[in-house]
């Protein structure tokens, strides 16, 4: 049996831009993408901590160390610049692998730089 599991997440980054006229996606600083093991064009789920919106899109890389978090296209309507968001990425794995898997969690500072990288621990 294949299970959909949290692969990684970028926790509490700040939206720096919202570009309604762009063709879809979220632009994420490449340094954050690397830290969270998120690939270009990978599907992500985004939760806006400020307004409760939850939606999906795909990732395009921003310039490394640019601190950019930009929602593009229709997703730009779901956020405001300055909102805090959580970006989550999922993967499929078999049940045996899932039992021992620990997702990557990238904690961000207020300026979207990396504060800490860790793994979820089981309770």
Swiss-Prot record:
GO-annotated biological processes: alanine biosynthetic process; pantothenate biosynthetic process
Pfam families, alphabetized: Asp_decarbox
EC number: 4.1.1.11
Catalytic reaction list: L-aspartate + H(+) = beta-alanine + CO2
Binding residues for substrate: 57, 73-75
Post-translational modification: Is synthesized initially as an inactive proenzyme, which is activated by self-cleavage at a specific serine bond to produce a beta-subunit with a hydroxyl group at its C-terminus and an alpha-subunit with a pyruvoyl group at its N-terminus.
Gene Ontology, cellular component aspect: cytosol
Subcellular location per the Swiss-Prot or TrEMBL entry: Cytoplasm
Active site: 25 (schiff-base intermediate with substrate), 58 (proton donor)
Pathway: Cofactor biosynthesis; (R)-pantothenate biosynthesis; beta-alanine from L-aspartate: step 1/1
Cofactor(s) needed for function: pyruvate
Top-level taxon in the UniProt lineage: Bacteria
Keywords noted in UniProt: Autocatalytic cleavage, Cytoplasm, Decarboxylase, Lyase, Pantothenate biosynthesis, Pyruvate, Schiff base, Zymogen
UniProt cofactor note: Binds 1 pyruvoyl group covalently per subunit.
InterPro entries: Asp_de-COase-like_dom_sf, Asp_decarbox
Keyword Cytoplasm recorded: yes
MF terms (GO), sorted A to Z: aspartate 1-decarboxylase activity
Residues annotated with Pyruvic acid (Ser) modification: 25
NCBIfam families: panD (TIGR00223)
Family: Belongs to the PanD family.
Annotated function: Catalyzes the pyruvoyl-dependent decarboxylation of aspartate to produce beta-alanine.
Complex and partners: Heterooctamer of four alpha and four beta subunits.
Protein name as catalogued: Aspartate 1-decarboxylase
Organism: Clostridium novyi (strain NT)
């Amino acid at each position: 049996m294949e299970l959909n599991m949290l692969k990684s997440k970028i926790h509490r980054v700040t939206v720096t831009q919202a570009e309604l006229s762009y063709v879809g996606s979220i632009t994420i600083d490449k340094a954050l993408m690397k830290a969270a093991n998120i690939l270009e064009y990978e599907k992500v789920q985004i939760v806006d901590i400020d307004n409760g919106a939850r939606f999906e899109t795909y990732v395009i890389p921003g310039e490394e160390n640019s601190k950019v978090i930009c929602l593009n296209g229709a997703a730009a309507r779901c956020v405001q610049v300055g909102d805090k968001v959580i970006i989550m990425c999922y993967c499929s794995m078999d049940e045996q692998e899932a039992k021992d898997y620990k997702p990557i969690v990238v904690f961000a500072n207020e300026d979207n730089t990396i504060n800490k990288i860790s793994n979820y621990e089981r309770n």
